[in-house]
Amino acid sequence: MTTIRTLVVAAEAFPLAKTGGLGDAVAGMVQALGHRPGGVDVQCELLMPAYRGTLDRLYRPRTVARLGGLPGGPASLVRGHCPGSGLSVLLLRNDALYDRPGIYVDDSGQGYPDNARRYAALAHAAARLAQGLPGLRPPHVVHAHDWHAALAPLLIHAAGLHYVKTLLTIHNLAFQGTFPAELASALGIPLACRHDDGALSDDRVNFLKAGIRYATRVTTVSRAYAREILTPAFGCGLHGLLRARGADLSPVPNGIDTALWNPAADPHLGGLRFDALDMRNKACCKAALQAELGLQLRADATVLAMGSRLTGQKMADVAIAALPALLEAHEHLQFALIGRGEPDLEAALRALAARYPGRCAVHIGYDEPLAHRLHAGADLLLHGSRFEPFGLTPLYAMRYGTLPVASRVGGMVDTIRDPGPAIEESCAGQGTGFLFDGSEPADMRQAVTRALRALAKPAVRDAMRRNAMQADFSWRTSAQAYAGLYANLASGPQRGRVPAPTLPLLANAA
């Protein structure tokens, strides 16, 4: 069997670095690919920046290459393995670029002003590895994730490395990595690609557009989102290019790490573990969560949880507007939130907690163990989104028998089964949650009210919880799809629709 060497390039991967779903998705995908999905032998190595503290998390790190001439200065490649998973990792080390308190933003929440150079350097390192470095065999496939890695397909193509195929996965089209066009030279973008049919959009360098334009194949993370991004409403200005690449665009849904998110074996729950066949400890998890967050200790309370970035995309503003009326109308309702984001939204949620002491708990920040306990102890998860490429958080919640109340957009259309408006025991069917249309507070309130009516019927509640906990959201099927794509890319003909300029890997602007 031929081994397909694949270099996975990403800005984050759990447990080395994580700010959200991207870190979980990359890590879960790479680990699943190590199990020969579909009988395909995939040898994955992950390339990511050496952020503060990541080197300390690697087993036996050693420097394997030094790279000069990168944007932001010279760097080194440090190879090691993740303890537990055994995942092979290459960290791009340049302390001036990456040794900082946050991954993307500073302590005030502002993006680092040199993020363009930071992630251009990552893409150039990927292109150097594609060329081959002493002691490091070149990959057959380079798999870039989101805008942070999206210059890699352009650079590999421009260097004439046609034997190395590239795959770009779009996790969130809204984040494109756009920067002033005058940075193009410093970022090492070839002159032949500095135009609107290349790496530029509206007179700005656009990392994600470059990746979509030059990658051999493009994927996104759910079937519904793959359809949505071809439309002006969801295409974020790139729908025309995506439609032009339609023959090379396909959905590969994400999965979740079902061993990590497993209420029957979750170390963060202590002795309060449970499963779909015996959910008695879920009530104990609720009591423990109430005590931890300062909520009233009421067994009859319904805990509505929210765990997400506090942004307009995640409809945090809508939740803030909808919650007071819900709390006033349902005296048994409690609200618990973990998240961080826009300062004004954080302040509004703190004010809500002060207005409803004992019924509303707000934890600003991200805490992985607490996130597990939140999903275990809550009854419902509120997950509104104006757009949602996939939606990992509802899947985590469902693993713990917490039913999502979510927007009918993107990946959640594929993963959440709504039993319909007339919720009786006989028609709970395969329902696993509740979907709503619209982005007004009234839309969200009506959906939560419908969910509360369902939970008031123990037979319906328990049936839906079992359905949710037993749904298969593992990486098995998705890993098989990626392995098949890699095999097709590695054995297929060269893609010929983009003319390859004869250019050095790092072109000079002069």
From Swiss-Prot:
Instruction: From the Swiss-Prot or TrEMBL record, give the protein name.
Output: Glycogen synthase
Binding sites annotated in the UniProt record for ADP-alpha-D-glucose = K18
Which family does the similarity line name?
Belongs to the glycosyltransferase 1 family. Bacterial/plant glycogen synthase subfamily.
A Pfam family cross-referenced in the UniProt record is Glycos_transf_1
Which GO molecular function terms does the record list?
Answer: alpha-1,4-glucan glucosyltransferase (ADP-glucose donor) activity; alpha-1,4-glucan glucosyltransferase (UDP-glucose donor) activity
| Family annotation (SUPFAM superfamilies) | UDP-Glycosyltransferase/glycogen phosphorylase (SSF53756)
Print the keywords alphabetically.
Answer: Glycogen biosynthesis, Glycosyltransferase, Transferase
Reaction equation(s) it catalyzes: [(1->4)-alpha-D-glucosyl](n) + ADP-alpha-D-glucose = [(1->4)-alpha-D-glucosyl](n+1) + ADP + H(+)
- Its gene name is glgA
Q: Tell me, what does this protein do in biology?
A: Synthesizes alpha-1,4-glucan chains using ADP-glucose.
For the biological process aspect of GO, one term held by this record is: glycogen biosynthetic process
Recorded metabolic or biological pathway in which this protein acts? Glycan biosynthesis; glycogen biosynthesis
Q: What EC number(s) would the UniProt record show?
A: 2.4.1.21
